[in-house]
């Protein structure tokens, strides 16, 4: 049994790219400046891989950008929600369709609706882009739960990560993908869902439906440097980092 202090000299992160790209690097730098405790590797292999890395002792922290299952909760002693992500549904910036309902999204992502003309758009085939369905990505699972009701995805073009999906949609007038709003770039537009725009205010007000927790997990009860970092992540300074692109936990 590893003690919590095992990783004290080299804190490491593996897991969701949403957390690993947009939060951990800046938070780790500030934490190191304040405490002298530095991070080693910061990975982005996805939520499932990060969870396994934490449970197997290969990473101090696993990052999961979705709700934990009951089985997962039983495997970890430490879990801290550091914020909430706004999930966006992105289309090409020139597409005239600006809003859809969750029921309409289900028709599209299940493969039952395959042309934008069904949604008052142009007569143009719909191409769904997604991170790899079998890759253990939090976005894939969260969207499947919140929009598809855990039914299977229809035909999709599978890519390695959210950045790739967004890049393809920016170049494809018929493309659509689900991803964290933190990955938004010029050339794409995020749809309003159920009449609510994907803004932090709409999530905080409860009108925008696609919201998910950002969680750091540890196998053992955190102590030493691990506990210090988790405590730090809930301080105003760290929550300000979270708040740049996400909804802070505090």
Where are these regions (language model features)?
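Exported/periplasmic ABC-transporter solute-binding proteins
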Residues: 1-250
